[in-house]
């Protein structure tokens, strides 16, 4: 397993400042967050290539997530969302990332009245994203998200239903397993056991089981010894991407000790 770091912790910094900071931290993997001040464009893609090329650092890209809902029941909004995500794929593919991570759709105020419509739109959008990914040879993954947010995919049972409905397309869709989110949902071990073969990317951050605080590793209630043991049992070979908002150095050192 390799240690990685998400740019989430420096999302409020100018892009150039963030890149210079990352270049000094000393991890094997960087996750670019295509959002806000760091939204990808041709200039930023070129900058990333110059900075990390030839250094043995692998990359992944987290798709835009602010105001993004692939299950929107408004055709106009959904078209805009899909256009933004497809543009993200286009720029991301130029970086040759290990994967591109996206969030599942969100229930809306009319979900109860329009039974299963948002679920069906979520499936439709996922199929569409998979088709787009094929154009670029891009591996895409869906992330498990936490309570209490009204996402359509949070728990194991929801993911089981989702993959069954995807059919053969589900074979091409991996999972980015977010340990912190699973802790809030009370399903860390269950999720790893059930979807071990689908997990191709892992986000690590801590919390106390009540709020998605994105604390440093070891600063919450998660038993990281058990987590690393469970991840090793599924022969995971990808990156452990620190997605904390602070205590970055401490998180990396804690993980290094656990992986010895």
Positions of PLM-derived features:
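Generic enzyme active-site microenvironment
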Residues: 29, 60, 141-142, 176-179, ...
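Residue-level detector of anion-binding/catalytic polar loops
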Residues: 28-29, 58, 98, 139, ...
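Active-site acidic/histidine proton-transfer and metal-coordination neighborhood
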Residues: 54, 75-174
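Active-site-proximal loop/turn and secondary-structure-junction residues that shape catalytic pockets
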Residues: 9-11, 34-36, 65-67, 104-108, ...
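Catalytic-core regions built around general acid/base machinery
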Residues: 43-56, 125-132, 191-194, 226-230
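Soluble or luminal CAZymes and related metallo-dependent hydrolases
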Residues: 14, 40, 44, 80-84, ...
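N-terminal pre-domain/capping segments
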Residues: 1-89, 93, 259-260
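Histidine-acidic metal/acid-base catalytic patches
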Residues: 1-2, 11-12, 16-23, 98, ...
């Amino acid at each position: 397993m390799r240690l990685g770091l998400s740019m989430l912790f420096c999302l409020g910094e100018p892009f150039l400042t963030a890149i210079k900071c990352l270049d000094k931290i000393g991890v094997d993997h960087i996750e670019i967050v295509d959002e806000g001040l760091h939204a990808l464009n041709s200039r930023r893609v070129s900058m990333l290539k110059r900075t990390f090329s030839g250094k043995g650092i692998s990359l992944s890209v987290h798709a835009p997530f602010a105001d993004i809902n692939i299950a929107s029941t408004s055709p106009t909004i959904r078209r805009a969302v899909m256009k933004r995500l497809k543009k993200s794929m286009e720029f991301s593919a130029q970086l040759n990332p290990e994967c591109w991570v996206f969030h599942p759709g969100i229930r809306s105020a009319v979900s109860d009245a329009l039974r299963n419509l948002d679920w069906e739109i979520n499936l439709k959008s996922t199929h569409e994203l998979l088709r787009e990914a094929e154009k670029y040879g891009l591996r895409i993954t869906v992330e498990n998200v936490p309570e209490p947010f009204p996402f359509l995919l949070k728990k194991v049972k929801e993911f089981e239903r989702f993959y069954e409905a995807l059919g053969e397309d589900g074979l091409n869709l991996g999972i980015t397993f977010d340990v912190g989110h699973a802790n809030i949902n009370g399903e860390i071990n269950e999720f790893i056991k059930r979807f071990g073969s689908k997990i191709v990317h892992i986000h690590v951050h801590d919390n106390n089981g009540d709020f998605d605080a994105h604390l440093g590793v070891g600063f919450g209630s998660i038993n990281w010894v058990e987590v690393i043991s469970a991840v090793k049992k599924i022969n995971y070979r990808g990156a452990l991407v620190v997605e904390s908002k602070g205590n970055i150095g401490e998180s990396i050192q804690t993980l290094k000790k656990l992986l010895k």
